[in-house]
A protein has these predicted regions:
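Sec-dependent bacterial lipoprotein signal peptides
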Residues: 1-30
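Acidic, polar-rich low-complexity tracts and alpha-helical solenoid repeat scaffolds
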Residues: 7-9, 26-258
Length: 258
């Protein structure tokens, strides 16, 4: 009441000025709110697509969030959900991308593009693979995702790239076993090397490192003075690749053991 009385005690030109400022602020706020709400779901989706295309990812995410909040039951929300996951994937935010692709598969399991969400969820795991790390959780998760994908979506347009990624995942896992076995061999832990390299032969018999693995098995047994086993692996190397450098070395070992 005191403020109101103070206002009326001011000269009329000041009162008019304050009223004018108040009304301008009021209408400006209403106008902004009105403009924000004036965008339809389809407009918000188009805007977010354009922003994403122009590499304005954060603004695109904001538009999608507005779409989700203002139009929770719209058909555009479905496309917005996929677009949000795609933006995270494009920005190499693979944990976030994986989360949103998973969410899409849960919310829209019968959608015509649900196979795409499953594929890119597995791709997100694949992208999280750090070849320099010993943590193989992401590549194992990716492998599982791609294998399940080809079972669930045998007619998908993503079938071929999914199979290619399975091969890459298997290569990474095989290479990991091989490198560990090779490390044990180099450090003189021959029994540990033998265990790893034998596991490689059993689990990945057609891998590109198999020939070298067989040679290192022969070398490991040779250094353990288990000459019968060493001989068997050297002969296998010569038989499988007679002109290779490993075969050349194997022949020298066999000659030395006579």
């Amino acid at each position: 009441e005191g403020v109101l009385m103070s206002l009326f005690s001011l000269p009329s030109k000041f009162v008019s000025f304050f009223i004018l400022v108040f009304l301008l602020a009021l209408f400006s706020g209403c106008s902004t709110t009105k403009n924000e709400k004036n965008y339809s779901a389809s407009q918000l989706l188009r805007q977010s697509k354009k922003l994403s295309k122009n590499d304005e990812s954060e603004k695109a995410k904001t538009k999608i969030q507005q779409l989700m909040e203002d139009y929770p039951d719209s058909k555009e929300r479905v496309a917005g959900s996929m677009l949000l996951a795609d933006i995270h994937f494009k920005e190499e935010e693979y944990e976030e991308a994986k989360f949103h692709y998973q969410k899409f598969t849960e919310l829209y399991p019968a959608h015509q593009f649900v196979d795409r969400a499953h594929f890119y969820k597995a791709m997100s795991n694949f992208k999280l693979t750090d070849l320099a790390s010993r943590d193989l959780t992401p590549v194992n998760s990716a492998l599982e995702g791609f294998q399940r994908f080809i079972e669930d979506f045998p007619k998908s347009s993503y079938l071929k790239p999914a199979k290619e990624k399975i091969t890459q995942c298997l290569d990474i896992l095989a290479q990991n076993i091989f490198e560990i076995g090779k490390f044990y061999y180099r450090t003189g832990s021959y029994q540990a090397a033998i265990l790893r390299l034998k596991r490689l032969k059993v689990e990945y018999p057609n891998h590109s490192y198999i020939l070298e693995a067989e040679f290192l098995l022969g070398e490991s047994y040779y250094r353990e003075q288990n000459f019968p086993e060493a001989t068997a692996y050297y002969k296998s190397v010569i038989k499988n690749s007679p002109r290779s450098e490993f075969a050349k070395e194997a022949r020298l070992r066999l000659k030395a053991m006579r």
